[in-house]
Structures are given as C-alpha cells and as structure tokens.
C-alpha cells in the first residue's frame, strides 16, 4: 500500500463497532472489531473482499440513529447507504454483519432550490434533536429533511435558512453540539453558534465569533478546523495558525464568547492545529501537521511527539 492509499480522510466506528475508513485514493474499508478486514465498499453498495474503489473523495462519514450511513464527498455530493442484507457471522458470538446497502445519491441541482447548496461536503452531524446538518465547503450550512414517503430536501440560505450568514459562513469545515443544544459551526471565517431548539427555521438566530486584535480572550485565528467537547463538558475550538482555544464563557449564544488560548508559547508543538480527541485518562490529544501534542487539562501542560519519530518507531 502506498502512502497515498494509506492517507485517511474520514473514519467512523459504527453501531456494530466496525471501523469504516475512507482513504485519499477513494477506497472505503470496513474492519471488524478484532481489526480484521471485512472488505471494501463498492459503488454498487456491496462489501466485498475484492479491492474496489468507491466514488471520489469521501471527506466525512456519519451513521445516523436509524443505522443509515452518510458519506460526504469533496466534489460529487452526498451518499446515503441503507442496509438491505446481512452476511455470515464474523468472529465468535458476533452478531451478523451487514454486507449490502442500497445507495442514494444527492447532488446540487441548479433548477431545484431545495437540493444541496454545494457538492463539496466536509462535515455531517446529527444533533440531539435528530436533525442532520451538512456542512458544505462553498455552500454553507444545510439541514437535511425527509418526508414519510422518502422525499429528501435540503434547507439552506437559498431557501428557508434565511438568517444564515452566508457571506461569512460559506466554507464550513466542522459541525458539533455543545451542552444545552448549542450547535457550533466551524468555518474558514470564524465560529458560528445557534440553538437547535427552534420552531421555525426562518427564526434561527446565528452568532458569530472571530479574532479581535488586541483581545486576548477572543479566538486566536478565524480558520476553524475542529471543535471538540470533552467528558467534562468543556469545549475547545481548534484553529489553523491559532492553536487551541478553550471556551470559558457559560453562554455560547453570544458574539462575545470568551476563550483561553494555548499556542506554541504555552508548549503546544505547532499552531497549525488540525483536530483534537480525548483518551481514557482524560488527556486531550491535539493533531498538527508535524506532531501529536498531549494536553493535560488540569495542569494545562503539553507533551509533544514528533510525527517523524512516531513513523520511525513503527518502521523499526
């Protein structure tokens, strides 16, 4: 396998504890809980042992609460996978695993105002009210809606999501939810927040937070790469060139959210931060282009591990 084939763009642990990975070379692999390869997802919706490429550039994967798999691509829209069959049991005392899906493809249609606002999808998220939000890199925020007869529509700034600040929120990288039903949208031009407790889409109020020069408690940078809430319900905003921004305000429905910033001056390996995840010991790992940084949120200290050293150790 080449480095190009191995580079992972998106991954998902599904409700059967299988791992889905989408590579830069357009392969989607599914692994069993024991780490063995179940197979590759084909364009026909089969999981097969034969190495087959899926469609172009999958950048995001979501399993919704009904068990459907959603795949967002860089330039050809959104795919919905619905299970239609099961395979023989995998491993000892394992439930039967799904091995075939029907595929539904959604794209931007210039003549349909309720189609996707853009075919470039970087993030898909289902919130606590079961709303599925789709973040487009070039089309802003979309709310996916489905009728009982199966018709799918997308609500965005070109139809009913009229208050969405498309001038600032055109390019969405990440969507998540903080405690209290606050949806956070990371864009290339700041952080957007709103409440998912709404009755009419036209009435949603959006709040925008950006870097304010001279204000040490504003965002360090506006290009938001990732947003993460840890087990202690503390939310962190990861910004490219701005490191880690910890939310210290109790109210996120505000245009004056206060942050505590951590960057190279505080021990972070690089300000070019990309994402964050928490481990079983409640340590937070920050991924950058050159290193992994382990952050102790109690002591507020970093331990850094250069990626080149990690790769060398794996090769020994």
Spans of features found by a protein language model:
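Carboxylate-rich, polar loop motifs that coordinate divalent cations or form catalytic acidic clusters
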Residues: 1-316
């Amino acid at each position: 396998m080449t480095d190009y084939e191995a580079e992972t763009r998106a991954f998902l642990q599904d409700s059967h504890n299988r791992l889905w990975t989408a590579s830069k070379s357009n392969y989607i692999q599914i692994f069993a809980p024991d780490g063995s390869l179940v197979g590759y997802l084909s364009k026909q919706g089969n999981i097969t042992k034969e190495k087959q490429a899926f469609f172009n550039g999958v950048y995001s994967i979501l399993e919704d609460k009904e068990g459907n798999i959603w795949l967002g691509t860089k330039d050809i829209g959104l795919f919905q996978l619905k299970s239609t069959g099961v395979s023989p049991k995998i491993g000892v005392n394992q439930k039967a695993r799904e091995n075939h899906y029907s595929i539904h493809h959604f794209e931007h249609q210039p003549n349909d105002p309720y189609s996707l606002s853009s075919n470039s999808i970087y993030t898909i998220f289902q919130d606590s009210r079961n709303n599925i939000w789709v973040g487009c890199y070039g089309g802003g925020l979309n709310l996916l809606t489905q009728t009982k007869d199966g018709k799918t529509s997308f609500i965005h700034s070109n139809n009913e999501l009229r208050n969405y600040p498309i001038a600032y929120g055109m390019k969405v990288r990440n969507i998540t939810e903080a405690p209290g039903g606050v949806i956070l949208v990371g864009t290339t031009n700041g952080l957007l927040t709103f409440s998912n407790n709404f009755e009419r889409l036209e009435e949603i109020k959006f709040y925008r937070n950006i870097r304010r020069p001279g204000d040490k408690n504003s965002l360090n940078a506006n290009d938001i790469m990732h947003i993460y809430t840890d087990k202690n319900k503390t939310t962190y905003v990861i910004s490219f060139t701005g490191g880690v921004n910890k939310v210290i305000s109790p109210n996120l429905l505000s245009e004056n959210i206060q942050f505590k910033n951590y960057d190279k001056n505080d021990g972070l390996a690089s300000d070019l931060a990309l994402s964050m995840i928490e481990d079983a010991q409640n340590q937070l790992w920050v991924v950058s282009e050159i290193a992994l940084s382990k952050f102790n949120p109690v002591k507020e200290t970093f331990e850094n591990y250069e990626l080149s050293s990690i790769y060398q150790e794996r090769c020994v």
